[in-house]
Amino acid sequence: MTETRLVIFDCDGVLVDSEPISVNVLVKAMNDLGVPITEDEVYGRFLGKSLATVIETMKSDYHVHAGEEFLERMRVDLYGRFRKELRPIEGIGETIDALDIPCCVASSSQVERIKLSLSVTGLIGKLPNIFSASMVKNGKPAPDLFLHAAREMQVEPKNCVVVEDSPAGIEAAKAAGMRVFAFTGGSHANFEGYRAELDRLSPEAVFDVMPELIHLIQKQKLDGMHP
């Protein structure tokens, strides 16, 4: 078993329990522009993907142009709710401390949003290395973001473990040649078809309590010692 030298965390739904807030804000904004979409549809189509992808889909599938006004309204509404409602995933701080392995964040969100999420939830000091899809050409499910993070952290892809909650993120990690663990402990994990889609992608492990990650990493170390 290859040694784990870097753990790459997705942000939304893995570090912070943000997906229900984000999806609610996005659906309302899309509905107001005349896009007839539900929260379940947004989860199924856009979980783990960038806002740029959402905007492209609105244009191609619904012939709706989302301009600066849409983006600014989304930002104001979302950030306001994050400051009031956002919570960390239970046990994430203790888990990061216990891992004793370099960690970083690689998210489809903008850097500003990632930093706000981590600041509000008290995690910013534990995760200073932040990488956003805005830093690469192609977002998830392309491998670009994870490869960029590994390169910046000076770790080979084969020595990285990615912790993801989205199908797009799992696909991206696999395409990058990294091992991937699927976390299903976020509040959004009960939407229809979610678990089935994750299982279809065959992540190396699926877990729903964050401290379990410590044992998964330790198990890899033991497996490496006893082939």
Q: Where on the chain are the PLM-derived regions?
A:
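Asp-based, Mg2+/Mn2+-dependent phosphohydrolase catalytic module
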Residues: 1-5, 93, 97, 110-111, ...
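Metal-dependent phosphoesterase signature
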Residues: 36, 56-94
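Conserved SAM-binding loop
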Residues: 15, 103, 162-163
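Helix-loop "lid/cap" segments that line or gate small-molecule binding pockets
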Residues: 29-30, 50-65, 117, 150, ...
